[in-house]
Design a protein with these regions (language model features):
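Hydrophobic alpha-helical segments, especially N-terminal targeting/anchoring helices
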Residues: 24, 37, 82, 120-123, ...
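Flavin (primarily FAD) binding-site architecture
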Residues: 53-67
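An anion/pyrophosphate-binding glycine-rich loop and adjacent beta-alpha core
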Residues: 78, 84-208
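A conserved short coil-to-beta-strand element within the FAD-binding core of flavoproteins
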Residues: 15-29
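Extended, hydrophobic alpha-helical segments in both membrane/secreted and soluble proteins
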Residues: 48-51, 71-78
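Core beta-strand elements of the Rossmann-like FAD/NAD(P) dinucleotide-binding domain
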Residues: 39-50
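A conserved beta-strand/loop element that lines the FAD pocket in flavoprotein oxidoreductases
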Residues: 6-19, 86-89
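Structured mid-domain segments that build the active-site/substrate or prosthetic-cofactor binding neighborhood
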Residues: 200, 207-223
Length: 223
């Protein structure tokens, strides 16, 4: 939607600028922002009748997450320090199946389990489908919080991660490759690009990751 307004010259985009602080009047009302040009470090004030902070989550607080690397939570932190209310910060969504990476973690969608993917690791030298054993009524379709806790327990408490690492298998190799491509093509491509292995033939290596921050700056009809 914003691009459409840009084309009509109704919106001006400032790229490579960093939000520094809010501009507050004597009554504590927000009247604009101060931002810094990251090319020349110049500061500039932008006054406005209203300010909308659409700055993403806080995934980088966790080091690595499925969020973009610019999701630092810094804008919300600045607003909080200037008097805004930050609510429900304890509600952090953990996704059970993510691909670890040097820069961030990449989401391996739950649709993989929905289409028949199985999670397992080795126990006593044999494949162990621990979700199916612990939760026989649901198996690999347990809710994401239960799946994430189970994987975390297997790796960190039981020490049964693959090759001693915090990893377990998300296995699609028993499924029809054509159906995998049709229904899961996006995550297959991501995994192949970043790992160099074919999930149709080799199980994917995954671990839970911070995914979404459900809380944030408090908004209501007065804010």
């Amino acid at each position: 939607q914003v691009r459409r307004y840009e084309e009509q010259k109704l919106v001006k985009k400032y790229e490579q600028w960093e939000f520094v602080r809010l501009i507050l009047d004597d009554n504590g009302e927000c009247r604009g922002i101060v931002a810094q040009n990251m090319y020349d470090m110049r500061m500039e004030a932008f006054t406005a009748d209203a300010v909308i902070l659409a700055t993403g989550g806080l995934g980088m607080v966790f080091g690595r997450s499925t969020n973009g690397t610019i999701s630092t939570g810094s804008a919300a932190s600045i607003a909080y320090q200037q008097g805004s209310i930050f609510g429900n910060g304890e509600f952090i969504q953990i996704h059970p199946t993510a691909l670890p990476g040097e820069d961030k973690r990449r989401l391996m969608s739950e649709s993989a389990r929905g289409e028949g993917g199985r999670i397992w690791t080795y126990k006593d030298g044999k494949p162990w489908y621990f979700l199916e054993e612990w939760y026989p009524a649901y198996g690999n379709l347990v809710p994401r919080d239960i799946a994430a806790r189970a994987i975390f327990k297997v790796c960190t408490e039981m020490g049964l991660g693959l090759n001693g690492q915090n990893l377990v298998n998300l296995d699609l190799t028993h499924l029809d490759p054509k159906e995998i491509d049709r229904k899961l093509g996006a995550i297959i491509e991501i995994y192949e690009n970043f790992v160099g292995e074919d999930p149709r033939k080799v199980p994917m290596k995954i671990f839970p990751s911070m995914h979404y921050s459900m809380g944030g700056l408090w908004t209501d009809y007065g804010h």
